[in-house]
Amino acid sequence: MIVTTSPNIEGKQIIEYKKIVFGEVITGVNFMKDIGAGLRNFFGGRSQGYEDELINAREEAIREMESRAKDIGANAVIGVDIDYEVLGADNGMLMVTASGTAVVIEVQDY
């Protein structure tokens, strides 16, 4: 499946626009990552634990969006946008949302 931030796919004709599809992931940040991030914040540097969590959440949100597009008969998602939100009383939750327009594009048989 082609997934792109562009409003079209160069060289491909969009045959049908299906609907907007979403993939959402909410993940908690664990205590040990918080301690490590706090120390890195104090001393400077990057928090690999938080970065890994962010990457995993983003990839899962995109996979979920792709799955929902496939479920409605789409073979591509265009205009993809990814949003991040920190949630919870102590900002201990991360929400990642991927959204885009599910479409059917022409398939060329060679």
UniProtKB/Swiss-Prot annotation:
Gene3D superfamilies per record: Hypothetical protein apc22750. Chain B
Highest taxon listed in the record's lineage: Bacteria
InterPro entries: UPF0145_dom_sf, UPF0145_YbjQ-like
Disulfide bonds: none
Bilayer-spanning residue ranges: none
Alphabetized Pfam families for the sequence: YbjQ_1
Family, similarity comment: Belongs to the UPF0145 family.
NCBIfam families per record: PRK01119.1
Name of the featured protein: UPF0145 protein lwe0170
UniProt organism field: Listeria welshimeri serovar 6b (strain ATCC 35897 / DSM 20650 / CCUG 15529 / CIP 8149 / NCTC 11857 / SLCC 5334 / V8)
Higher taxonomy: Bacteria, Bacillati, Bacillota, Bacilli, Bacillales
